[in-house]
């Protein structure tokens, strides 16, 4: 913090005192911000992150990147709040960076407890453990989940105009 003095006071001992107060306020500000910075999930040390994760009941699965673990810890409360609804489940997938997801419920009359999750093949291949963890942690109890792979394919349709006359002749057979 730089303290700006009027031009007639900006010389000598007063300018030294202004610099001293600027440094002191920077120290006080850093001391006030320290508790908030130490609990920031995106920037804290990995040891503190593990303590926060324990507090929020988030376990790191094997081979999970640190950045994804930080996201899971950061959004643990929101994910728990959104669990159980179709729109909330889609928001969980978006927050954790999985991407576009479709969810269909009660599509079968006999197996009404099955929930179908439609995702792309690359999402399923790259994030299998994360998908299983999300379903196990935030999925509904007494429900079964299936994955259905959707593939994006570009289709070209050409159209044109075709003018013609049409006549029909009917014959009555006795």
UniProtKB/Swiss-Prot annotation:
Domain of life: Viruses
Keywords: Viral tail protein, Virion
Induction of synthesis: Expressed in the late phase of the viral replicative cycle.
Record localization: Virion
Disulfide linkage: none
Record-level GO cellular component terms: virus tail
Similarity remark: Belongs to the P2likevirus gpI protein family.
Function: Putative tail protein.
Record-given protein name: Putative tail protein gp30
Provenance organism: Haemophilus phage HP1 (strain HP1c1) (Bacteriophage HP1)
Organism taxonomic ancestry: Viruses, Duplodnaviria, Heunggongvirae, Uroviricota, Caudoviricetes
């Amino acid at each position: 913090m730089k303290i700006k003095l009027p031009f007639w006071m900006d010389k000598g001992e007063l300018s030294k005192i202004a610099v001293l107060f600027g440094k002191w306020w920077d120290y006080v500000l850093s001391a006030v911000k320290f508790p908030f910075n130490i609990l920031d999930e995106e920037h804290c040390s990995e040891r503190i992150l593990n303590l926060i994760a324990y507090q929020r009941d988030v376990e790191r699965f094997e081979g999970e990147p640190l950045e994804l673990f930080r996201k899971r810890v950061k959004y643990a409360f929101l994910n728990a709040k959104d669990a159980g609804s179709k729109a909330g489940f889609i928001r969980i997938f978006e927050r954790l960076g999985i991407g576009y997801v479709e969810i269909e419920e009660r599509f079968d009359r006999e197996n009404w407890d099955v929930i179908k999750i439609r995702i792309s093949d690359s999402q399923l291949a790259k994030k299998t453990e994360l998908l299983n963890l999300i379903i196990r942690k935030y999925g509904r109890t007494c429900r079964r989940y299936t994955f259905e792979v959707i593939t994006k394919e570009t289709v070209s349709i050409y159209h044109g105009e075709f003018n013609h006359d049409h006549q029909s002749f009917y014959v009555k057979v006795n």
